[in-house]
From Swiss-Prot:
Keywords for this protein: AIDS, Host nucleus, Host-virus interaction, Inhibition of host innate immune response by virus, Viral immunoevasion, Virion
Lineage: superkingdom: Viruses
Family per record: Belongs to the lentivirus VPX protein family.
Predominant subcellular localization, coarse grouping: virion
UniProt-listed Pfam families: VPR
Biased composition (Pro residues): 102-112
Keyword Cytoplasm among UniProt keywords: no
Region of interest (Disordered), residue spans: 92-112
Keyword Nucleotide-binding: no
Annotated spans, Binds to human NUP153: 61-80
Protein's GO biological process: symbiont-mediated suppression of host innate immune response; viral life cycle
Protein's name according to its UniProt entry: Protein Vpx
Amino acid sequence: MAGPRETIPPGNSGEETIGEAFEWLDRTVEAINREAVNHLPRELIFQVWQRSWRYWHDEQGMSISYTKYRYLCLMQKAMFIHSKRGCTCLGGGHGPGGWRSGPPPPPPPGLV
């Protein structure tokens, strides 16, 4: 028989927590994208999104949630550096950015 320390407390099976974490990740990725578009060129945001998927998901075989997490870390760092260097955007944003030739990549979540 399992001791009291070995049982899972009621309401903490882990399933709810995992589901909530995935929802938080999706909401946070969308939120940072909506804010980043006011500070960073759209093409930069799109390229980071595409390259994150290509590298972490396609090449390394990591899960979708891990790929989103790595993308989120990169975007948080980009936003931090942008702010640290003295953001003067004042919500004006950078517009669509200078697209390369050819069609633009599909947008990341929150920028559809």
